[in-house]
Regions:
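Short, surface-exposed connector motifs at secondary-structure boundaries
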Residues: 1, 22, 42-48, 221-226
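Conserved small-residue-rich beta-alpha loop and adjacent elements
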Residues: 1-23, 69, 91
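Short beta->alpha connector loops at strand-helix junctions that form conserved
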Residues: 3-5, 32, 52-53, 85-86
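A structured beta-alpha segment of the ubiquitous adenosine-cofactor-binding alpha/beta core
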Residues: 29-47
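Short, well-ordered alpha-helical microsegments
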Residues: 38, 58-59, 239
Length: 327
């Protein structure tokens, strides 16, 4: 049974057509509706529950599943960092960050949520970021055939409130009538700012800067267990040290969102960003119950296994052997 979001009716219609063409009636079903339908579904006893959504709702799903000991996979959100080192190919980094951030208008769970850029390259980075945005979407992104729209008016309003009071480097325009929200880049002075408290899930890219490794560590430690983690650096030792010392679901060095392309790589979160993993063979394993068993021969039987005397040679040998291998 699939329960898509009530906000994505067009996607639901496409899924319905695919299912009707691919499966016999009754094998796979789609259930439409709002949160009340989702709550009713959670009251049923399932073999497995797979949920994609916010951490807040993920906790509700996990709590409901626990009542019947139903296993779950939770693919949740995350405040995904993107670190830009001083030793970096800036133009290429900008192009790849723009692709990963603004695809589907920033409405992906693995989009970079903010940039932490080294102060030594900050101004050059911002200049080239703006240039690449203009090249990608044109100076009027409203007319670009490559730029998406926000899912609904409610979220356009939410995003418009997020950017109030910030110094805008690029964008900031929106249109409630057609759910347009311009690609937006803004400066953030503190890791405690409201815009960085939660996953943005939209085309807004806050820019933080750091000077020392200690400052960068302080920034990264502020956000627990993101779903994705990105580092742009020509210094692979520096990049790998960040990868090793931070907990996250999956990530990339010198790229964004590329980690989901390889079907052999498992995808999933950790801690607040999710439980379990899937993609490729991992998806098959996720939705399968591995049931081990043996078939015992009836042609011979070892009688001593039923009653092993402490005086027997086999018992003495076994005890000495176990002591030997435990040394």
């Amino acid at each position: 049974v699939l329960k898509p979001s009530e906000h994505s009716s067009n996607t639901t219609n496409i899924l319905q057509k695919i299912i009707e063409k691919s499966f016999e009636r009754g094998h796979v079903d789609i259930v439409s509706g709002g949160p009340e339908i989702g709550q009713k579904l959670l009251e049923l006893n399932w073999d497995y529950i797979f949920f994609t959504g916010s951490t807040e709702i993920g906790k509700i799903v996990a709590s409901s599943a626990a009542k019947t000991l139903t296993p779950v996979t939770l693919e949740l959100g995350g405040n995904n960092p993107c670190v830009v080192d001083k030793d970096v190919s800036i133009k290429l980094a900008c192009k790849r960050i723009i692709f990963g951030k603004f695809i589907n208008c920033g409405q992906t769970c693995i989009a970079p949520n903010f940039i932490a850029v080294n102060k030594k390259v900050k101004q050059e980075f911002l200049k080239k970021l703006v240039n690449e945005l203009n090249k990608t979407f044109g100076k009027n992104s409203h007319e670009s055939p490559y730029y998406s729209r926000i899912i609904n008016k409610k979220h356009v309003e939410r995003l418009s409130k997020l950017i109030k009071g910030y110094k805008l480097i690029y964008g900031g325009n929106f249109n409630l009538e057609n759910n347009f929200f311009e690609p937006t880049v803004l400066e953030v002075s503190s890791i405690k700012d409201n815009i960085l408290k939660d996953e943005i899930f939209g085309p807004i890219l806050p820019i933080l800067s750091y000077d020392t490794t200690e400052e960068l560590t302080e920034i990264l430690n502020e956000y627990e267990n993101p779903l994705a983690f990105y580092v742009f650096s020509n210094n692979i030792s520096f990049a790998e040290s960040l990868i090793s010392n931070n907990s996250f679901g999956g990530g990339a060095i010198n790229d964004t969102i590329g980690q989901i392309v390889n079907k052999k790589l498992p995808f999933g979160g950790v801690g607040n960003s999710g439980i379990g993993k899937y993609h490729g063979y991992e998806s098959f394993k996720t939705f399968s119950h591995f049931k081990p068993y043996i078939i015992k021969s009836n042609y011979f039987d070892l009688s001593f296994k039923y009653k092993l005397s402490e005086d027997s040679l086999l018992f003495k040998f076994t005890r000495k052997f176990l002591r030997y291998i435990s040394i």
